[in-house]
Structure formats: structure tokens, C-alpha cells
């Protein structure tokens, strides 16, 4: 039963890691992200792109 719990925790953590698997785009020269950034499977209304450590990362609302 303990192995089952560990297996579920492992699967959940792998799922959460795969959700954030979006290729990073370098920031523009003005420390902003390109306007044409979009992810086909997620509506743009739910995402907010921001420049962090010279790469564009997304945050969900």
C-alpha cells in the first residue's frame, strides 16, 4: 500500500512537470516578451507572459 502511494505521488509530480513544459523564448531588448507568443492548447486569456532571467516565462491567472 505504501508503494501505491509513492506511485501516485510520482505520477502526479510528472504530470505537473509536463504541464509547464513550454519552450522558453529569450526576452526582447526592452525586457519584454514577443507579442506573438501563444500556446495552441491554452487560450491566451489564461496566460500572462513575463520576462524573468532573460527568458519569457508564463504564469496562469
Swiss-Prot record:
Note: Contains 4 cysteines arranged in two pairs in such a way that they might be capable of binding a metal ion.
Source species of the chain: Pisum sativum
Keyword field contains Nuclease: no
GO-annotated biological processes: nodulation
Superkingdom, natural source: Eukaryota
Protein name stated in the entry: Nodulin-14
Keywords, sorted A to Z: Metal-binding, Nodulation, Signal
Gene name linked to the record: ENOD14
Signal peptide start and end residues: 1-20
InterPro entries: Nodulin_late_dom
Keyword Iron-sulfur: no
Any GO molecular function: metal ion binding
Amino acid at each position: 500500500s505504501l508503494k501505491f502511494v509513492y506511485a501516485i505521488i510520482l505520477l502526479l509530480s510528472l504530470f505537473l512537470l509536463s504541464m509547464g513544459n513550454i519552450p522558453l523564448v529569450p526576452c526582447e531588448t526592452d525586457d519584454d516578451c514577443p507579442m506573438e507568443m501563444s500556446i495552441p492548447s491554452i487560450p491566451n486569456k489564461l496566460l500572462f507572459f513575463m520576462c524573468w532571467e532573460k527568458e519569457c516565462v508564463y504564469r496562469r491567472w
